[in-house]
UniProtKB/Swiss-Prot annotation:
Top EC class, one word: oxidoreductase
Modified-residue entries (Phosphoserine), positions: 351
InterPro entries: Ald_DH/histidinol_DH, Ald_DH_C, Ald_DH_CS_CYS, Ald_DH_CS_GLU, Ald_DH_N, Aldehyde_DH_dom
Active-site feature positions: 286, 320
Modified residues (Phosphotyrosine): 168
GO molecular function terms attached to this record: 3-chloroallyl aldehyde dehydrogenase activity; retinal binding; retinal dehydrogenase activity
Keywords: Cytoplasm, Lipid metabolism, NAD, Oxidoreductase, Phosphoprotein
A biological-process GO annotation: 9-cis-retinoic acid biosynthetic process
Function: Catalyzes the NAD-dependent oxidation of aldehyde substrates, such as all-trans-retinal and all-trans-13,14-dihydroretinal, to their corresponding carboxylic acids, all-trans-retinoate and all-trans-13,14-dihydroretinoate, respectively. Retinoate signaling is critical for the transcriptional control of many genes, for instance it is crucial for initiation of meiosis in both male and female. Recognizes retinal as substrate, both in its free form and when bound to cellular retinol-binding protein. Lacks activity with benzaldehyde, acetaldehyde and octanal.
Quaternary data: Homotetramer.
PANTHER family with a match to the protein in the record: ALDEHYDE DEHYDROGENASE-RELATED
Name assigned to this protein: Retinal dehydrogenase 2
The reaction(s) this protein catalyses: retinal + NAD(+) + H2O = retinoate + NADH + 2 H(+); all-trans-retinal + NAD(+) + H2O = all-trans-retinoate + NADH + 2 H(+); all-trans-13,14-dihydroretinal + NAD(+) + H2O = all-trans-13,14-dihydroretinoate + NADH + 2 H(+)
Amino acid sequence: MTSSEIAMPGEVKADPAALMASLQLLPSPTPNLEIKYTKIFINNEWQNSESGRVFPVCNPATGEQVCEVQEADKVDIDKAVQAARLAFSLGSVWRRMDASERGRLLDKLADLVERDRATLATMESLNGGKPFLQAFYIDLQGVIKTLRYYAGWADKIHGMTIPVDGDYFTFTRHEPIGVCGQIIPWNFPLLMFTWKIAPALCCGNTVVIKPAEQTPLSALYMGALIKEAGFPPGVVNILPGYGPTAGAAIASHIGIDKIAFTGSTEVGKLIQEAAGRSNLKRVTLELGGKSPNIIFADADLDYAVEQAHQGVFFNQGQCCTAGSRIFVEESIYEEFVKRSVERAKRRIVGSPFDPTTEQGPQIDKKQYNKVLELIQSGVAEGAKLECGGKGLGRKGFFIEPTVFSNVTDDMRIAKEEIFGPVQEILRFKTMDEVIERANNSDFGLVAAVFTNDINKALMVSSAMQAGTVWINCYNALNAQSPFGGFKMSGNGREMGEFGLREYSEVKTVTVKIPQKNS
């Protein structure tokens, strides 16, 4: 599922009048959503934090408080790690469980997510500000597919026999690492929760996971579904809290064997340092990006404009994959800018629960201010502000879709990850030039190229210093393909078969035998 292809029912028409007439075909948000789960989830039980502290959870569309959630700190992390270690101990129910049964539990969890899909999508919109239909058709679709994908892998992770010299029989085993600490971001709360727990549980690990303090509600709801699905106590523990306390405790905990983090490069560095200083726990990092999107003159212009638009503005621009450095070949530059501005001006910004809304609010006041400050830096440094550039409305954290032209590589908006609805359009003359400029970044998460020349496409894709390259598409992510970054965009891979390698150890076993026969 891609950001620009929301799979709505076929009967829903494309033109606005027909769309409004057929809205009854679309799913509806859960009315008067009750927030049931606001406590820490340890050992399949809901608990108050040891400190008794709570923190507010807000609706970014209004700025108003939704509820308060128990705040986990180091003491609570210690309790969760103890529960996870007990669940992982030799002879435990979880360790003795058949791999096929682990797969069945993941499939059952997917069934429960499908049952509660509208409720979870409502929660993602209420707590995270994303349009409900995008949450329902993209985020929740990704959650379900990821759970089912790894459910299918559970009993298919095989070792091998190795023909070594001498009278020996040698084979390998793929074993779970142990207790996995996981820290997830606020931009895709439920999807990132699933990206983390699904491969870990598939391999037989146990989990201590911290959702972002801005968006803990859907992760806590998943705790109830995990218990209902039948996962044993202690296998998954969910602890909402802040990075400097709960997150730091996970990163440095001696009882945690592996950590996976999605978030900023700055915090990723701190986590890798803490992992090294403590017990050299294994680390997977999915960090920031400043991704190049290269548009050649022979591309389908209307299609490239729409894909580039979605590649930046999807999810309010709050994507690590955002194609925010759009390099356009000189001969089509002015026309591309013109059409991009027209498209941005048509983008509908509004309530996440309005079915016509394309863009909701930024996550909070801090992020809102950061985006507006970077927009002002673009103006100050000489980029041409084609449209947008301001906050929108009296309530909430909405920002106008913003387009800059005449952007140069040395500007802050061309170098720093904005994480907001801001499109920067740069021009280039030659392939060699654009390859060098596209790679001239500390980041290397994704890249894209739009062209009708397959030789040009393959040449550029092989030259890009990025973990994923899209040709004539953008944000085409799926459960089957590995995802991760080069350079300061992180290390390790999530998703696909490669994602399993991050959650298992390979053990070699050699047996002395009386006589070997080939």
